[in-house]
Amino acid sequence: MKILFDYQIFFLQRYGGISNYFFNLIKEFNKKKIVNKVYAPLYINEYINNLKLDNKFGININLNFFKINYFLNKLFFSLFIKIYKPNIIHLTYYENNNFQKKTKKYILTVYDMIHEEFSLNFKKNKTSINKLNICNRVDHIITISKNTKKKLIEF
């Protein structure tokens, strides 16, 4: 079985709880000899620099050209899926642009429901809409806590 982690959170977070969660998950997979790879062609994350070379693909960049770099990540990721042929794709955030649903299983981790609980503070932010859409498309959802699971079911 081959697991592929996408680029999203590694492109969006230099440091942070979500990227640290994935960094630790990947380290545990390595201990258990579960084949996995992070494909983040262009990333800003510092945790990913500490992964073994055979666990990652990409280069650390600065964010001067955010939109162009994000587009390139999406493009390269969809091509890499065809080359790497993972059994499972674990999405690291809530964009849902890289679906090849018929041939792969998709997993999503939901970290919290902050955007939904405090929606008045996030009026222009599309995270809630993206999260709802992606939750309806993936094969399996992991929640960080029982409380997050309860709130996700309520929304």
Please give the residue ranges for each predicted region.
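Carbohydrate transferase catalytic cores enriched for Leloir-type hexosyltransferases
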Residues: 1-155
